[in-house]
Structures are given as structure tokens and as C-alpha cells.
UniProtKB/Swiss-Prot annotation:
Binding site for Mg(2+) 2: 137, 139
PROSITE patterns: TOPO_IA_1, TOPO_IA_2, TOPRIM
Organism: Candidozyma auris (Yeast)
One Gene Ontology CC term in the entry: nucleus
Catalytic activity line of the entry: ATP-independent breakage of single-stranded DNA, followed by passage and rejoining
UniProt-annotated catalytic positions: 354
Function: Introduces a single-strand break via transesterification at a target site in duplex DNA. Releases the supercoiling and torsional tension of DNA introduced during the DNA replication and transcription by transiently cleaving and rejoining one strand of the DNA duplex. The scissile phosphodiester is attacked by the catalytic tyrosine of the enzyme, resulting in the formation of a DNA-(5'-phosphotyrosyl)-enzyme intermediate and the expulsion of a 3'-OH DNA strand.
Cofactor: Mg(2+)
Protein family membership: Belongs to the type IA topoisomerase family.
Name the UniProt record assigns to this protein: DNA topoisomerase 3
Domain Toprim: start-end pairs: 21-175
Gene: TOP3
Keyword Glycoprotein: no
Alphabetical UniProt keywords: DNA-binding, Isomerase, Magnesium, Metal-binding, Topoisomerase
Length: 640
């Protein structure tokens, strides 16, 4: 028996020795586990790595062009290398200004860092690998982490280089999609790597030197505690500036009185309010002169125009990361970071597509009806999904943005809401309803407009009847309701006012900044990316530059004395220089990073254009450092 099985055993050993060994590395252990499960058909064998929260999954898989391979799927937990200055440039070892020219070191984390175990695991698993496949998130940051993984693996095994490293392109964890990604890998995009390297080094250099400069000033005057850090960030300060600017506008607001003319006509027992074409005026006497002219003499108001025309309320665009954060903040009073964290968990669980995307147009090849079908069993929106498949489906609108990396956010598979945590439940329901709304028809209605002329003044009444709700049936976040139906008026008809009076009002102050408004401003001004905006907002709160406060039904940002003084001080110091507080420099940086990603410019091109501007601002600030401490003292007294 032993002799008869010997040739078979030798054949198996020979096959194993000739099989290629492929090391796959994901950005998170949850992704590694799911991808391994899919590619192995559920037969992956887990074993411990050198970091307790990451497992290694062994299985066999047939890659196109390689035949059957022995595969190990593992993961990292974000970046595996650190970029910093050398020890001679540590805090207290040199003046902050020297960091403008200090070289960078990219190195492994210290042994006490949790990443050390992850890095050692990559080194160990890479030693016997013939190929490396990167399964990090498919964005700029993920590409850079992929390059870090390759660099570490190459140090342990020179065979693993750009030629033998693949990059899996995927946006969700549906099995068919993951298999397609495994069978159609690409090369690492070193242009994206260069863009992240540029942004990392630039932000680290400028952020570190200004942070040390500010902290030294505040501590020298004992304005902050010994362990406190007054940090500067190229995105952080423009974000703070938006909040402070709004706060100042609210505090400095002085209401102004205005006057308007309200006219009402009653016909067939129905009162119809007409709006004055001038809206309101700030000259009380002039309004009363017009009012007196209207009332004198026998001339009656006359209907000069009646029209009824179809109108539409457009369905929403496909969902981007920024829109997800704004909507969750507005509709659910959820912090933007909490919304994004919940979306990340839904993605890693396979419920939605990758939630970090700037794209607001679905690719033509995406099987939209297939994903609608997966929602038909829902008790909450299944009826609407079924209706779409029975003939009500309409192609989604297309926006103007395509990041070329990921489609908009959409539901990949059905989920039972009862099994999800509260934040995840809200986000998942919103993603599904938004997707189904995108695949529905616009809401439709009839708008009636009646124009009335009375002497020299024009008044207008509007009516709206919603005739087809369509996407509104599944998307309760959009409000479009019928107004009172207007009675029939005829052009040329004279009417008798049932009331006409002068109404006095006052201008209203702007509201304090909400998170949804702040995110919209940051997005419009190029501050941060879809993936980082929430972090920048959270950071100004963590640094005690702003506080969150409930006013009425809204949670708003109120700047602290520290936050206000920082903005006021830099405004005063750099009054004739380029501002560190406005979005111009950061917007320019984001534009440059996109150009690096396309291969149009290099990192050095960006450094040579932008760094001198920050250097000039630093030199000016360094000479007038007393303004920073003086402003803080004055602001604190003013708010106390």
C-alpha cells in the first residue's frame, strides 16, 4: 500500500515545489479575511501573525498566466513606514525655521509601535514569495501604502519589485467583483505614490515647524499648559478660519428694519396671498408713498398673466463621500467622522461599495438593476425596488466628477437593519434610499403663476400641485409638497383686494456654522479630500480651537478664545502677505497633487513654487511673534 502511494506523494511534492508563491496584502484584516474567503472558496487556513489583530490566510488559487499558486493573504493596519526628521532636528534641538531645509527619513516604526509586528510579519511572509499582490484601498493613500508594503517586502526578498508586484483594483467585496480583481491586476501607479509623498513631506515640514513655533510662543508666556501643543496644519487653519469668519459675522450683525406690502385677494371663498415684486425695501417712507398711491382712487388690481406649466423636482445625484457626510450631519445630526466610520464598517462587511469617492456618475457597465433586485425583499423599500424593475426604472443622473478610481457609493447586498448598529443602520438606509432614488424618475408637478398689476406695482401668486412623486416615495430626505391650489383667474380680470397692508420686518443674522455647512465650504474651496475632510473638522475640535454647541435643533461650531486669537493674529501679521488662513494655498496644493497624479509635474516643481511662500510667511510671523501672544490675551479678556 505504501509503495503504491509513493509516486502520488512524490508528484504532489513536486507540484508544490514548482507552484508559484503569491503574497497578498490588504489594508485591513477584515478585508484580508473576506478576500481570502472568496478566492479560496471558504477553504482558507488561518494562522497567527506577529501582530495579534492580523491573521495570515493560506490557500490555493489559480491566477491567470501563473496556474495554481500557493497564496498567503495577510494585512497591515494603515501605514507601515514612518516619515520624520532625523534626531538632530528633534523638538528643542534646533530652531523651528531650520526644518525648511531639513532632510526626511523614511524608516520602520520603533519596536514599541504596534506596526513593528505588522512589518515583521510582512518581512517573514515575503521571504519565500515569488509575487506580491497589493489589496489596499484603491485611492492615492492606498497606493502609497502599497508602495510601502512593496518596499518592506523587497528588503526581505529582492525578487519582489515593481515588475513582480501586482495591484488589485476593487471597489467592494462582492465575490464576482473580487475574483475579477484577482484575475485582472495592474501595476502600482508610482505617479499616485509621488503625489502622496509630496503631500506628506510638505504637510509634515510646514506643519511641524509652525506647530513648534506657536507652541513655544504660548508656553513662553504661560498661556497654555506644559503638555499642551498649539498645532498648525495647512488644512486645519483654513477650516478654523471658516468657523471664525462666520462667528464674527454673527457677533457683529446689527439687524436692519425693512418694509413690504402684503396683498391678498379672496375668490370663491379662497384667500390668495400675492407677493410684491420688490420683495421688501429699507426705505420706510418710500414704501408708504407707494402704499398710499395704491389705495387712492377707484382703480382696481388687474390680472395680467395666468400660466400653468409642468415642472420637475430633480432626483439626487449619485452619492459621493462629501455628500454622504453632509447629509448624515444634516438629516441624522451625526458627526461627519462617525458617518464615515460607519460607512467604512459597512464596506468591510460587504454591504456597500467603497465609501471614499469623489465620483457622482455611475459607470455604464455597472449592473444597476442587479443591485436593485437585491433590495426587493426589504419591508421598508422593497415595494419601490420592485416597481423600478417592473418598468419605472430611469437611468441615474450624471454629475461632473469622476475620480477614475471608484464609482459612487451604492448598496452591494441586502442587510437586515435589525442586525446593524444604530449609526450603521442610518447610513445603510440612507445609501440604499439614495441609490433607489437615483434609479427612479424625477418628481413631477404643475406650477401655476398668476401675475397681478395694481397701478405701477406688480404682485405674483404661485401654486404647485405635485402630480407624480416618483423618487420622493423612497427618498424622504427631500421635501417637495403641493401648495394650495389657486382658484381660476382670467387674464384681464379685475379683482378686489381683501386686504392690503404694510408689513415691517428685520433682517436676520447668519447662523453659526454647522458641520454640514463647513464640509460644503471645505469641499468647494479645495480644503482636504473626500477622505480627509472629516478628520480636519474633528482635529480643530480636538485641539480646542472650536467647541460644538446645541442651539435650537442644530449643533454648531463656536470658536474658542484660542481659535479666534490664532486667526486674528495671523490676519494682523500677514496683512500684506499671502494668507495662511484662506484656502488659496491649500487649493493650489490639491491642484498640484492632481497634476502629479497625472504625470504632468513633479514633486520638486510643487516644492519650489509653494515652499517659498510659507517660508516668507514664517519669517514675518517669527519677527512679530509678540502679536500672537498679545492677541490671545486680548481675546481672552474680551470673551470673559
Amino acid at each position: 500500500m505504501l509503495i503504491s502511494t509513493l509516486p502520488l506523494l512524490l508528484h504532489e511534492q513536486l507540484a508544490q515545489s514548482t507552484r508559484m508563491r503569491v503574497l497578498c496584502v490588504a489594508e485591513k484584516n477584515s478585508i484580508a479575511k473576506e478576500v481570502a474567503k472568496i478566492l479560496s472558496g471558504g477553504r482558507a487556513r488561518p494562522r497567527n501573525s506577529l501582530y495579534k489583530y492580523v491573521k495570515n490566510y493560506d490557500f490555493q488559487y489559480t491566477f491567470q498566466g501563473l496556474g495554481p499558486c500557493d497564496v498567503t493573504m495577510t494585512a497591515v493596519a494603515g501605514h507601515v513606514l514612518t516619515t520624520d526628521f532625523g534626531p538632530e532636528y528633534a523638538w528643542g534641538k534646533c530652531p523651528p525655521g531650520r526644518l525648511f531645509d531639513a532632510p526626511f527619513l523614511t524608516k520602520p516604526p520603533p519596536d514599541r509601535d504596534q506596526r513593528a509586528g505588522i512589518l515583521k510579519n510582512i518581512i517573514r511572509e515575503a521571504r519565500n514569495a515569488d509575487r506580491l499582490m497589493i489589496w489596499t484601498d484603491c485611492d492615492r493613500e492606498g497606493e502609497y501604502i502599497g508602495w510601502e508594503i512593496m518596499s518592506v517586502a523587497q528588503g526581505a526578498n529582492p525578487r519582489l519589485n515593481l515588475q513582480t508586484t501586482w495591484r488589485a483594483q476593487f471597489s467592494h467585496l462582492e465575490p464576482q467583483h473580487i475574483v475579477a480583481a484577482a484575475n485582472n491586476p495592474k501595476a502600482l501607479d508610482m505617479k499616485l505614490v509621488a503625489a502622496v509623498e509630496c503631500r506628506t513631506e510638505f504637510d509634515l515640514r510646514v506643519g511641524t515647524l509652525f506647530t513648534r513655533f506657536l507652541t513655544n510662543i504660548y508656553k513662553s508666556k504661560r498661556l497654555v499648559g506644559e503638555k499642551e501643543v498649539v498645532s498648525y496644519g495647512t488644512c486645519q487653519f483654513p477650516t478654523l478660519s471658516f468657523v471664525v469668519d462666520r462667528y464674527v459675522r454673527v457677533r457683529n450683525f446689527r439687524p436692519e428694519p425693512f418694509w413690504s406690502i402684503d396683498l391678498a385677494v379672496t375668490k370663491n371663498g379662497q384667500k390668495v396671498n400675492f407677493s410684491w415684486s420688490r420683495n421688501h425695501l429699507f426705505d420706510r417712507m418710500f414704501v408708504y408713498v407707494i402704499y398710499a398711491q395704491l389705495l387712492e382712487g377707484p382703480q382696481k388690481p388687474r390680472i395680467v398673466g395666468v400660466s400653468t406649466k409642468p415642472t420637475s423636482h430633480y432626483k439626487p445625484l449619485p452619492l459621493t463621500t462629501v455628500d454622504l457626510q453632509k447629509c448624515c450631519s444634516r438629516y441624522f445630526k451625526m458627526l461627519a467622522k462617525a458617518a464615515l466610520d460607519a460607512a467604512e464598517l459597512l464596506y468591510t462587511a460587504g454591504y456597500i461599495s467603497y465609501p471614499r469617492t469623489e465620483t457622482d456618475q455611475f459607470p455604464a457597465k455597472l449592473d444597476l438593476k442587479g443591485y436593485i433586485t437585491k433590495q426587493t425583499l426589504s419591508l421598508d423599500w422593497g415595494t419601490h425596488a420592485t416597481r423600478l424593475l417592473q418598468g419605472s426604472f430611469r437611468p441615474p443622473r450624471g454629475g461632473k466628477h469622476d475620480d477614475k478610481a471608484h464609482p459612487p457609493i451604492y448598496p452591494v447586498k441586502s442587510a437586515s437593519l435589525d442586525t446593524l448598529r444604530p449609526d450603521q443602520r442610518k447610513v445603510y438606509e440612507f445609501v440604499v434610499r439614495r441609490f433607489l432614488a437615483c434609479c427612479s424618475d424625477d418628481a413631477r408637478g404643475l406650477q401655476t403663476k398668476v401675475d397681478l398689476q395694481w397701478r405701477s406695482e406688480r404682485f405674483t401668486a404661485l401654486g404647485l400641485q405635485v402630480t407624480e412623486r416618483n423618487f420622493l416615495d423612497v427618498y424622504p430626505y427631500s421635501d417637495w409638497k403641493s401648495l394650495a391650489q389657486l382658484p381660476e383667474f382670467a387674464e384681464g380680470e379685475e379683482v378686489t383686494p381683501s386686504s392690503c397692508k404694510v408689513k415691517e420686518g428685520k433682517t436676520s443674522p447668519p447662523n453659526y456654522m454647522t458641520e454640514a455647512e463647513l464640509i460644503a465650504l471645505m469641499d468647494a474651496n479645495g480644503i482636504g479630500t473626500d477622505a480627509t475632510i472629516a478628520d480636519h473638522v474633528e482635529k480643530i475640535a480636538q485641539r480646542n480651537y472650536v467647541t460644538r454647541r446645541k442651539i435650537g435643533k442644530s449643533e454648531v461650531f463656536i470658536p474658542t478664545s484660542l481659535g479666534i486669537s490664532l486667526i486674528d493674529a495671523f490676519d494682523a501679521i500677514l496683512i500684506d502677505r499671502i494668507s495662511l488662513l484662506k484656502p488659496f494655498l491649500r487649493r493650489a496644493m490639491e491642484g498640484f497633487l492632481q497634476k502629479i497624479s497625472r504625470g504632468e509635474i513633479t514633486k520638486q516643481d510643487v516644492i519650489s513654487q509653494l515652499l517659498p511662500l510659507y517660508k516668507e510667511a514664517f519669517m514675518e510671523s517669527n519677527q512679530k511673534g509678540h502679536v500672537i501672544s498679545d492677541t490671545f490675551i486680548q481675546t481672552s479678556r474680551g470673551l470673559s
